[in-house]
């Protein structure tokens, strides 16, 4: 899964988080983006706020979608590894290396699933800030 900072690595959770951090840059800088691109009332004639807000909204949605796909892809990949390790453990329940690896993968899977919750909070925060500043200039389409 390609990401702005490189390839999303599902095997190493630290790298996975680092790439997500880079992918969340647009959300982290939403206030700055709005302050520098959406005019206040006194400067409203100099910039097309409707177009600016529309472009920013589209960028946000694209970033949210790509992160969601990346996280879900890694969850799917890690779930498959967990399933395979469970099968191996069922065949050989005394193999400590399989049991240890299974625990490690299960922990990683739980951490990746928790990233979906983090993603929801980040997205909600960004959209709240966006709506506070752009609601008079641009109304995004309703998400089905």
From Swiss-Prot:
It comes from the Eukaryota. Pfam families: MIX23. Residues 82-120 form a coiled coil. The keyword DNA-binding does not apply. Disulfide bonds: none annotated. InterPro entries: MIX23. Signal peptide: none annotated. Belongs to the MIX23 family. This is Protein MIX23.
